[in-house]
Amino acid sequence: MLDYRFPTALQMVLSAAMAEQMGERSTSAILAYGLEANPSFIRKLMVPLTRDGIIVSTLGRNGSIHLGRPADKITLRDIYLSVIEDKKLWASRPDVPARCVVSANACWYFKSVADEAEQASLNVLARHTVASALEAVKNADTSGCDPVPEMIARFKKAH
């Protein structure tokens, strides 16, 4: 089963950062619209992101979602660890009976390789911040899309 928590959380945080840069509001409804995701999934991901100080959410009619600290102080590793928590990158098979040299040693060997790969991935994510990721996205953009979802413009017209 594919796990979309990290890429969705990354897009949420980048969207909130973009909205902040533009002086616009960001809400769970706006994020859900921009991500074409279920609003309940967005709210579920907001829990660990808020707990870990990555985002701050204010309630009420004018409530919004903001970054919990400066964009250059939030790494992609922070976001990943927040939403993935203790789930391993790759799950190893349960220990199997030792019937030959391979079955006696494959589990520990796989775990050591998986741990090394996971650490390498975390090191890469630690080198990227929300600020650098947002700058890269903006610099590479050729979509012609508005910086924030058009839902914000519709929201402004209604209020």
Predicted regions and their residues:
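C-terminal regulatory/oligomerization modules of transcriptional regulators
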Residues: 93-159
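A short alpha-helical element within helix-turn-helix/winged-helix DNA-binding domains
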Residues: 25-36
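Beta-hairpin "wing" of winged helix-turn-helix
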Residues: 52-68
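Short alpha-helical segments that sit at the start of domains
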Residues: 1-13
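Basic amphipathic alpha-helical segments that dock to polyanions
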Residues: 45-52
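Conserved segment of winged-helix/HTH DNA-binding domains
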Residues: 71-96, 114-119
